[in-house]
């Protein structure tokens, strides 16, 4: 093989290795940043296709904060609360300042890591804007298995239970 062909072959191989490494790193980064969305029922019972998250997996969970479940640590910013749709409840532990719209009975989406089968250590908690708004993922997941809630005018105004 003459020197010109060797040089060309080396250049092609280097280009192939570089492109392969770039694609591999991009796929790895995308996989690390992917958070799957679950409802509390799907987290406990599994999704319809049978998949269940593993302990240590990053995920997002959406549902309603269960009334009477919010427990605040008096020595830190840590808060634990339960989230449910119409099925099982899942405990969310969050160490930080909660959004102003966070309250019991309110819809939330928490992003974090699954600590055990029914506990999530969240690093972000988002509250929905009003009683009518629901994050698209939560609405879609709840629409599949649940009937929509019918609010009275008092409940919409925030004066009734």
Curated annotation (Swiss-Prot):
Phylogenetic lineage: Bacteria, Pseudomonadati, Pseudomonadota, Gammaproteobacteria, Vibrionales
GO biological process per UniProt: cytochrome complex assembly
All ranges on the Cytoplasmic side of the membrane: 1-8
UniProt-listed Pfam families: CcmE (PF03100)
Region of interest called Disordered, as start-end residue ranges on this chain: 142-161
Major localization class: membrane
UniProt protein name: Cytochrome c-type biogenesis protein CcmE
GO molecular function, one term: heme binding
Transmembrane portions of the chain: 9-29
